[in-house]
Amino acid sequence: MSHDMTSRELYLRLLTYVRPYWKAFLAALACMGVASLAEPVFPAIMKSLLDDGFSKANGPWDWLFYPLAIMGIFLVRAIFGFLGDYLMSWVSNNVVAELRQAMFARMVRLPTRYYSDNLSGRLMSRIAYDVTGVAGAATNALTSLIKDSLSIVGLLVWLLWLNWQLTLITLSVVPFIAIVVRVFSKRLRSVARGQQESMGKITQVLQEAIEGHKVVKIFGGQSYEEDRFYESIREQRRLAMRATLASAAQSPLVQFFAASGVAIIMGVALKQASSDQTTVGSFVSFVTAMLMLMAPLKRVTDVNAPIQRGLAAAESVFSLVDEETEPDSGKEELGRAQGLVEFDGVTFTYPGSERPALDSVSLTVRPGECVALVGPSGSGKTTAANLLPRFYALDAGEIRVDGHALPNIRLNSLRDNIALVSQDVVLFNDTIGANIAYGGKRDATLDEIRAAAKAAHALEFIDALPEGLNTMIGENGVKLSGGQRQRLAIARAILKDAPILILDEATSALDTESERHVQAALDELMRGRSTLVIAHRLSTIERADRIIALAHGHKQEEGSHAELLAHDGLYARLYRMQKAEEVAV
């Protein structure tokens, strides 16, 4: 996993994303190199000026040379520094965009179990926040590291040429600086991981408060949510201060060792000057180069914190990119299925649960037949619906479509033959037309979309809207009523025209008028399709070809509505209870 990768391995992997932009990357490095290598030219000019300029300047051009040379140096630094920064930023922003795309592409292909086991807020935080951390390491931090490192190398080369003895004294403090940086790097990386987890919790609390704002208001949960949010941001603040403490402590220590080296050097240089072992120009040039060395050295040590944050973020990013996608080892293509669905001794247990949600359940849905699953909460109805499209893998038994075992069928081929309409309608912040013609049907014609909407009894309210099919419906269809949202979901399923249909309590949350429209749309949708209905309101499935009653994951009884009432078992008891409740209301 990515948490086991070293810093070098993480950087090398990041560089694989840089490969498509290698020309711009090399150009950025070249520009930074020119800008950085202009650094030692300034102290070199200072040496020449002090040793030769004042005493040997006779002609008019001698007086202009040094001012023009200094202006030229800083002009070169400015131009090439700008080009280097811009090109490196262009490369890094493209890399970040590709990383986000890679994360999103992997996310939409993750197995359903991953979403059950991981907080959605943390997943959102990884794509939004963690990639930004990589951007910080890839832009500002990386730019500073490259540019300042080249400046340090250039100045050290000049110092070695000028006085190698003094330079060796300078380098003697490097091991101490390296130890400080190494110790603090581990600390900063650890804290950065904690900050990422903390940001995920903040995002989760925000998401729940926003999505559940009506519940928060009705039940007076404002203070409770404020406390939850305060706890999450307090943890983030605590971790931020730990990171600041490590970063702030590192910089003075590095500067102390560097200043100690400078102090020793100045003492030795003064002794050499007193014995005529060095010139004034050489001494001033050496001290100037030493002082110029301090700024890039400080920036290089300061950049350690964002680099460690970036590496911790890269670990998080690659851990998502490396997650295994849904297993899809099937080779068989269904084409358009006839619609024969068979559950044969199916057993499934949710992770962390001791009792199977389904235990040795067998059932058959013949082509064009409507089979309803009923039972109390927790009986396994929705689990059966989730297993047919292979949202989860079975523990035991087998599910077949047209005689083909699910693991042998290509995942896309299987799901192309299944449409789903559930109680929890999912709509996207797009137009009505785009929500009907979603996914594989996005190239549907206007006539096909209108025909699907008409069959779903949705065209009447759509045409009443000023912009019709082009109406934006807001997040999850917030601008529409429950019945309207449900009919759009049915229109989407009608347009898909899949031979197998799953209805998961599709009318349980609707009022009577909305249910009448939706039930009419469902009747249109179910015609000629193999339909598996998960029902809570038993009155909606009286016309089903067969009804299967489940309890505690076991099949209790099977038959038509009339047969099960005559049997006077579980279904009959549930039916009488609901009828009594309806009369009481």
UniProtKB/Swiss-Prot annotation:
It is a multi-pass membrane protein. Keywords: ATP-binding, Cell inner membrane, Cell membrane, Lipid transport, Membrane, Nucleotide-binding, Translocase, Transmembrane, Transmembrane helix, Transport. InterPro entries: AAA+_ATPase, ABC1_TM_dom, ABC1_TM_sf, ABC_transporter-like_ATP-bd, ABC_transporter-like_CS, ABC_transpr_lipidA, P-loop_NTPase, Type_1_exporter. Its EC number is 7.5.2.6. It is found in: Cell inner membrane. Residues 26-309 form the ABC transmembrane type-1 domain. The keyword Signal does not apply. It catalyses: ATP + H2O + lipid A-core oligosaccharideSide 1 = ADP + phosphate + lipid A-core oligosaccharideSide 2. Residues 341-577 form the ABC transporter domain. SUPFAM superfamilies: ABC transporter transmembrane region, P-loop containing nucleoside triphosphate hydrolases. Pfam families: ABC_membrane (PF00664), ABC_tran (PF00005). GO terms for cellular component: plasma membrane. ATP binds at G375, P376, S377, G378, S379, G380, K381, T382. Belongs to the ABC transporter superfamily. Lipid exporter (TC 3.A.1.106) family. NCBIfam families: MsbA_lipidA. Involved in lipopolysaccharide (LPS) biosynthesis. Translocates lipid A-core from the inner to the outer leaflet of the inner membrane. Transmembrane domains (TMD) form a pore in the inner membrane and the ATP-binding domain (NBD) is responsible for energy generation. Homodimer. This is ATP-dependent lipid A-core flippase. It comes from Dechloromonas aromatica (strain RCB). The lineage of its organism: Bacteria, Pseudomonadati, Pseudomonadota, Betaproteobacteria, Rhodocyclales. The gene is msbA.
